[in-house]
Amino acid sequence: MKLVVCEAHLYINCVGEKKLLGATVTSDLKWDKNVELMTRQANINMKYLHSAKKFFHDTKILKQIYLTWIRNNVEFGAVVWHSSLTQELELKIERIQKAAVRVIMGNNYTTYDEGLQRLKLDKLSERRRKICLTFAKKSLKLKQFSKLFPLNDNDHNMLKRNGNRYVINQHLTERYKVSTIPYLQRLLNEDFHERKKQFKRILSPVDINVCYTAGKI
């Protein structure tokens, strides 16, 4: 993007898309182009996996090739764009891993879910969710980033059974609702509630009758 200064006026050339820090941003703020470029590169790199399959049948080696040369391509900058993906784009990205699992498993491939279980892999959508949550948690430890996730000081809210720990930015549009910051705020609250449930389960009183029965067995 070029800047042209003319006396008191500043002219900016408008472009339809721009690559910023590895992510392709378009003027409509959609991620179709970014996903297209990522999946295209991932499909190109799939040749490494197909070539390796001719010489290796060890799934550990093939899995490592996939993680190094293919999966990285479809996860770069995921924190920025994951929450705004349409279902169609999510499926397009997931198909990359599905194809890779089929190659790695070879004749042992039955279903995608079973392949993931045997290779100890998460679905890409779940991995992106974990990446986003990890980013949000790390941001809480940084002074500048933690300001994006203010604690909820509303006493009435905190007294509620499902009161949120972190403020969720109000939104007037669906686009802002699914954008990165509100999404990360919701993730932090979901994680807070989940950890609170786990803590309650640990502290919950043990059923004496169950213990007695187990002891007799």
Q: What residues fall within each predicted segment?
A:
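Non-catalytic, peripheral interaction segments enriched in hydrophobic/basic residues
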Residues: E17-Q144
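Short linear motifs embedded in intrinsically disordered, charge-biased segments
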Residues: T86-E88, K92-I217
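Short, glycine-/Ser/Thr-/acidic-enriched flexible segments
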Residues: L10, T26, K30, Q185-L187
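Surface polyanion/phosphate-binding segment centered on an Asp-His-Pro turn
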Residues: I12-G16, D28, K33, L37-Q41, ...
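Short, conserved micro-motifs composed of acidic
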Residues: M1-G16
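Intrinsically disordered, low-complexity regulatory regions of eukaryotic regulatory proteins
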Residues: V5, F56, N73, L151-D153, ...
